[in-house]
Design a protein with these regions (language model features):
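N-terminal auxiliary segments of SAM/dcSAM-dependent transferases
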Residues: 2-40
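A short glycine-rich, Lys/Arg-flanked "PGG" loop and its adjoining helix->strand segment in the class I
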Residues: 178-193
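Hydrophobic beta-strand segment of the Class I
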Residues: 49, 165-166
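Core SAM-dependent methyltransferase catalytic element
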Residues: 256-277
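Conserved alpha-helix/loop element of class I SAM-dependent methyltransferases that forms part
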Residues: 58-81, 96, 100
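Class I SAM-dependent methyltransferase SAM/SAH-binding core
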Residues: 82-154
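Conserved class I S-adenosyl-L-methionine
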Residues: 193-222
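A short acidic, Gly/Pro-enriched loop at the edge of an enzyme's catalytic core
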Residues: 153-165
Length: 277
């Protein structure tokens, strides 16, 4: 597995000084206000969220979701596995995990179909935006996925329930990153695995081109299509505020995770954090 790059982000691009607690939308004072502002933003763009994601990422987001689901294929195929996709939004990562269940991990599994000698895997998608979950449910007809409206910092699940917890482009929006990691750790079963897929900032020429697109072009297109400016001005700011890979790995270790790694995707534009309980 690829290990994290020691310098994936230009130091001058990161906020300096105090330790970052969590997301901080403009004007939000405190964690409760930050969480409410994030919920309001995603509610405002829910109707066109999927279209914008695919257009603005030039469909690379689909590659990232599928690659992440493939990484966790073995866990997904464990008999009776319980899987949680946290901050699931309209469900794209959730659906990628579900699709992976149809791909056997071995010839023997292909013959018997699905998880061997045990109950089927159950996938949950959780988000605190009602509007986003409504969209996810509309897209999930015919799929055995349970949707739960829940706050990632106070999950309604018992400790040790899940063999896998994922989050794609949602963890960055939490009002408190350490509390978010603590909740993931709590709901994971012993030896359970976690994966956080989120944006980074690449280096070199690719990084310079990416920053122009991400900070100038993307907000303009997002605002034009959605008719709402706030979320697409917030997006690049939230990526800048998010901890660097080195710091995220330190936070994961502090939360109790071991075997922590960061694997860059597409020149470091995005990357996958992994850890085990």
């Amino acid at each position: 597995m690829a290990q994290h790059d020691k310098s994936p982000i230009e130091p001058s691009d990161r906020p300096m000084g105090e330790r970052i607690v969590g997301a901080a939308p403009a004007g939000a004072q405190g964690e409760a206000a930050a969480a409410e502002a994030v919920r309001d933003m995603f509610t405002s763009i829910a109707p066109r969220y999927d279209l914008l994601n695919h257009v603005l990422s030039m469909n690379i987001d689909r590659v990232w979701w599928n690659r992440t689901a493939r990484v966790f294929s073995e866990v997904l195929h464990r008999p009776g596995a319980q899987v949680l996709d946290l901050c699931c939004g309209t469900g794209d990562m959730t659906f990628a995990l579900h699709r992976r269940l149809t791909i056997p991990t071995s010839a023997k599994a292909a013959l018997v179909g699905g998880p061997m000698n045990g109950a089927p895997t159950q996938i949950f998608g959780a988000d605190f935006s009602h509007a986003m979950l409504v969209r996810a449910e509309q897209k999930s007809v015919g799929r055995n996925i349970r949707w739960v409206e829940a706050d990632a910092l106070n999950l309604p699940f018992p400790s040790g329930q899940f063999q896998l917890v994922t989050s794609a482009f949602g963890f960055r929006n939490l009002a408190n990153y350490d509390r978010g990691l603590a909740e993931i750790y709590r709901v994971l079963a012993p030896q359970g695995e976690m994966g956080i897929l989120d944006f980074g900032e690449p280096k070199g020429l690719i990084g310079k081109l990416y920053r122009v697109y991400f900070r100038r072009v993307l907000p303009a297109i997002g605002t034009l299509i959605s008719g709402v400016r706030g979320p697409y001005a917030y997006l690049p700011a939230s990526v800048l505020r998010f901890p660097s890979p080195d710091e995220m790995l330190q936070r994961m270790r502090a939360a109790g995770f071991h075997e922590v790694t960061w694997t860059p995707y597409t020149f470091g534009i995005a990357g996958l954090y992994r850890g085990k309980k």
